[in-house]
């Protein structure tokens, strides 16, 4: 028997001094109220959407809180922010920026739209402006260095602002401010020693400076922490290739391919090594496969060079 039936049955079976008409009025009121309560219970998602200022954190390997967990009590800010997220996911960056700007105007003390604004500028390769947005978010959040002291490095959820530091480091790397970027990555590693991403980014920053031996060490650390992640295996292979360690490089590329066989980069890199070793048939095989996965001018140019070398070798013979 549901709640409504129970209440009606209790009412009808209880002696009362009310006349029949009064009972009908009271009974109708009870039905209206209880039905309303049932509707609220059956549709509690409506309430949760209205109060969407603090959605639950998305699951991740290190249980970090999402940026949205910063929260806001301003409904207009929340709606503009959510609209911005939809535009960002659709890669409609101009509209995303407008929405995030509106959210910031509605609630200037909410860091989440500042962070996403920075991420949008990052996608547009406007790294300087992205960093300005991240720094404004830091200003809203307060002194994070003080909050660092309360972080449990091995257990429990990690704070959302670790991601902001990482994003700022990536922007600094793209601006070739490698020392500043590596300093941020080092700080992240000290806070979360089990996170592979900063090690991979350190390797990339070192590689950009031609410090390939040091880069190999950084990529090694990334692969140890996340052995199923193809990117550091591929990057390690390229750093090894740059130091002339072709066999080790090929082994790293093979590992990347085994983890992500439809990714064109390690296939291209294998082809480049065989091209440099004058093994043109092997080089052609891998480069053609890379092209079948993704059309790329750089890959097409390498294939043309391989074909030219093959024709030249055939003519000489």
Which residues are covered by each model-predicted region?
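Register position in tetratricopeptide repeats
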Residues: 89, 123-124, 174, 208, ...
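Residue-level recognition of tetratricopeptide repeat
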Residues: 76, 110, 144, 161, ...
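TPR alpha-solenoid repeat register
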Residues: 113, 147, 164, 198, ...
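Alpha-helical segment of the N-proximal tetratricopeptide repeat
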Residues: 75-106, 119, 167-174
